[in-house]
From Swiss-Prot:
The lineage of its organism: Eukaryota, Metazoa, Chordata, Craniata, Vertebrata. GO terms for molecular function: neurohypophyseal hormone activity. Seven disulfide bonds are present in neurophysin. This is Isotocin-neurophysin IT 1. Keywords: Amidation, Cleavage on pair of basic residues, Disulfide bond, Hormone, Secreted, Signal. InterPro entries: Neurhyp_horm (IPR000981), Neurhyp_horm_dom_sf (IPR036387), Neurohypophysial_hormone_CS (IPR022423). The modification Glycine amide is found at G29. Residues 1-20 form the signal peptide. It holds the Pfam family Hormone_5. GO terms for cellular component: extracellular space; secretory granule. Coiled coil: none annotated.
Length: 157
């Protein structure tokens, strides 16, 4: 009889530990409070705060393109420490929950890629002015490839 009650008590203890929030992933107010937070815009970033954070080291905006792993995007790390989720806006693009970040560029939390679905008629004019001919497209592809292979800049204290 005593063994059964101890087993039941241990089972209840393990169950409570398994369903508990941990310090790193528990929102303020408990697990169910995450749905109570209203969505908000992601933090501003980049030159003149004209961009929005798309990930911990990605800052993109209309007319400025995207900064990945650069000092302009360094402030985006703070987004990880805020208790409520944010939305960057823009159309859904890419295969992994990406959003249109700038004309012709789709970004998610991990990185950015060229995506033609992010190009509208008025945005196509912006691209043709800033990047001319297929040579410009090749240059943009090389830059995106370089950015994805270079480690982010680190600030050492």
């Amino acid at each position: 009889m005593f063994g059964t009650s101890v087993s039941a008590l241990c089972l209840l203890f393990l169950l409570s530990v398994c369903t508990a929030c941990y310090i790193s992933n528990c929102p303020i107010g408990g697990k169910r409070s995450a749905l109570a937070f209203p969505s908000r815009k992601c933090m501003s970033c980049g030159p003149g705060d004209r961009g929005r954070c798309f990930g911990p080291n990605i800052c993109c905006g209309e007319g400025m393109g995207c900064y990945v792993g650069s000092p302009e995007a360094a402030g985006c790390v703070e987004e990880n420490y805020l208790p409520s989720p944010c939305e960057v806006g823009g159309r859904v693009c890419g295969s992994e929950e990406g959003r249109c970040a700038a004309p012709g560029i789709c970004c998610d939390v991990e990185g950015c890629s060229i995506d033609q679905s992010c190009t509208e008629e008025d945005e196509a004019e912006y691209i043709s002015q800033s990047v001319s001919s297929s040579h410009g497209h090749d240059l943009l592809m090389k830059l995106l490839n370089m950015i994805s292979h270079t480690p982010p800049h680190r600030v050492h204290k």
